[in-house]
Curated annotation (Swiss-Prot):
Catalytic activity: 2-deoxy-D-ribose 5-phosphate = D-glyceraldehyde 3-phosphate + acetaldehyde
Catalytic residue positions: 106, 168, 197
Lyase found in the keyword field: yes
Pathway: Carbohydrate degradation; 2-deoxy-D-ribose 1-phosphate degradation; D-glyceraldehyde 3-phosphate and acetaldehyde from 2-deoxy-alpha-D-ribose 1-phosphate: step 2/2
GO cellular component: cytoplasm
Superkingdom of origin organism: Bacteria
Phylogenetic lineage: Bacteria, Pseudomonadati, Pseudomonadota, Alphaproteobacteria, Hyphomicrobiales
Enzyme Commission number(s) of this protein: 4.1.2.4
SMART domains: DeoC (SM01133)
UniProt organism field: Sinorhizobium medicae (strain WSM419) (Ensifer medicae)
Name of the featured protein: Deoxyribose-phosphate aldolase
Subcellular location: Cytoplasm
GO biological-process terms attached to the record: 2-deoxyribose 1-phosphate catabolic process; carbohydrate catabolic process; deoxyribonucleotide catabolic process
Function in brief: Catalyzes a reversible aldol reaction between acetaldehyde and D-glyceraldehyde 3-phosphate to generate 2-deoxy-D-ribose 5-phosphate.
């Protein structure tokens, strides 16, 4: 049920540390190495990014490198990147990651089942994983590049009622950038019942400000781009990013 718990307005402006506290960085491409994960942890902690994510086999290492009790959470992906794993596989993977120290998980939705109209399967799978890892929060990835507008609405509604913490736009494994138009579809559908994480092609402070005004509360951004954006924020007048801007 929609309880509007996430509908608070965004702040009027953000300082660099506030911005970093909205950004996840990651090393989840197939070619990322142990050295990349170590660098990821170092950057995440130094910059105060809210989360760092690594591929499942590197999550224990990442957990050991990020100080407990600090501002940076450790996360990992589930059913990544295709979403085509069975529900039992996703539960097992998510449970192992949670037991290994992951503090939040991003799970790929089963796109094939969604596009086949098997809504019951998609809904029950998300709920099963949410229950298996509770209280670890789950973000559900839609991969918008593969979906029609109607499928985005359907998937967003499923996530909103599933007990997941976030609906997320994409994995970062497709070339398509997240657009404002498709974010609006998600925001209008979920009506604040679940938080929104935008990921994919976010490369400017203006885009972040616009997305925050739409209701986005978390961003997945390329590590170097994220560092650059925090630096750009620090260079703005008063070292603050204006969010209030023109309302849509």
């Amino acid at each position: 049920m929609n309880d509007n718990r996430h509908r608070s307005k965004p702040p009027a402006s953000l300082a660099p540390r506030d911005l970093a506290a909205l950004i996840d960085i990651s090393a989840v491409q197939a070619f990322h190495t142990e050295a990349d994960v170590r660098e990821l942890a170092e950057i995440a902690v130094a910059e105060g990014f809210i989360a760092a994510h690594a591929l499942p086999n590197f999550v224990p290492l990442l957990r050991s490198l990020v100080p407990p009790g600090g501002p940076t959470l450790v996360g990992g992906p589930v059913g990544f990147p295709s979403g085509g794993h069975t529900t039992r596989m996703k539960i097992a993977e998510a449970s192992e990651l949670a037991e290994g120290g992951a503090q939040e998980l991003d799970m790929m939705i089963n796109v094939g089942r969604l596009k086949s109209g098997d809504i019951g399967y998609v809904r029950s799978e998300i709920r099963a994983v949410v229950e298996a890892i509770a209280p670890v929060p789950l973000k559900v990835i839609l991969e918008l590049a593969h979906l029609t507008d109607e499928e985005i609405r359907t998937a967003s509604a499923i996530v909103a009622e599933s007990g997941a913490a976030f609906v997320k736009t994409g994995t970062g494994w497709t070339p398509s950038a997240t657009t404002l138009e498709r974010l609006k579809l998600i925001a209008v559908t979920v009506e604040g019942a679940v938080e929104i994480k935008a990921a994919g092609g976010i490369r400017s402070l203006d885009a972040i400000a616009e997305m925050l005004r739409l209701g986005v509360t978390r961003f997945g951004i390329n590590t170097q781009v994220a560092v650059d954006l925090v630096r750009q924020c620090a260079a703005l007048p008063g070292s603050r990013l204006d969010i209030a801007g023109k309302a849509d």
